[in-house]
Amino acid sequence: MTDAEMEKIWNNLKRNLKSYCDENGFSDVMLGLSGGLDSAIVSVLACDALGAEHVHALMMKTDYTSELSLQIAAKIAALNGFDYKVVDIQPVIDNQKRFLAGVFGEEAKNIVLENLQARERGKTLMACSNQFGYLVLACGNKSESAMGYCTLYGDTCGGISPIGNLYKSRIFELARWRNTLNEALPEAVIERAPSAELSAGQKDEDSLPPYHVLDTILAAYLDDGQTEAQIVKSGFAEKTVRWVIRQYHRMAFKREQTPKALSLS
């Protein structure tokens, strides 16, 4: 994308987020700030749209939260001047783990424990929404949503999804462009490998194709209407293309339950 195109998208997102908040009676918004790029860009967008005094963020750490994530999240809050707090949700996860072992009659599987973390974060944000009257912003992107790489009732919680119509590759571009205006995002949050940090050493690309591959396939299939055969013919591995398309259709049940994504126009 050109600088002009990115500026247009950013301004449209700002306008649409402000309009959505006004129309629904919200002056303030809240999000989970993870130290990753998606929540980082959403926090900056919210500050640009509403003013930093109307943005509130929680870093909800667990045993898998890296020191780098804590440092990055704190730096983003400092650069942009919004309300920020760190809370430790590991004790809640540990209690849930013990409770579920009793329910199951055996130890919970890793996938259960991973999703517990995301759901505890979502539950905490929604509790804050009830307590303080904030609109919760979901921080998922179009790539994750298409692949179902998200936790229902966890990171999908929220009243609106500001970047839900942006592929991950576009978010990297948009972040770099936004930093040309002023330093709103630490370079480390743009450079680091994406990770949900729900287990030790976890990386997005352990579960998904590289984003530049995934997003090109998704754009060809969803936006350009190309067939599987046409996408393969353009140079992608048949196995990868088939997996992406099948996963997209398999994960429709998740997309049906995610918040509305802001329009880019």
Can you say where each PLM-predicted feature lies in the sequence?
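ATP/NTP-dependent adenylation/nucleotidyl-transfer catalytic domains that generate, transfer
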Residues: 1-34, 41-265
